[in-house]
From Swiss-Prot:
Entry coiled-coil feature ranges: none
Species per Swiss-Prot/TrEMBL record: Oldenlandia affinis
Protein name: Kalata-B13
Database matches in PROSITE patterns: CYCLOTIDE, CYCLOTIDE_MOEBIUS
Function comment: Probably participates in a plant defense mechanism.
Pfam families assigned: Cyclotide
Protein family membership: Belongs to the cyclotide family. Moebius subfamily.
InterPro entries to which the protein is assigned, alphabetical: Cyclotide (IPR005535), Cyclotide_moebius_CS (IPR012324), Cyclotide_sf (IPR036146)
Annotated S-S bridges: 5-19, 9-21, 14-27
Crosslink feature (Cyclopeptide (Gly-Asp)) location: 1-30
Protein origin, superkingdom: Eukaryota
GO biological process, one term: defense response
Processing after translation: This is a cyclic peptide.
Amino acid sequence: GLPVCGETCFGGTCNTPGCACDPWPVCTRD
């Protein structure tokens, strides 16, 4: 399945592919 977004991204970068730091500071599906 697809990777799950949801990590915190206080630095503005998400480590999970296909995820965006929006709304900050939580990664959500880009």
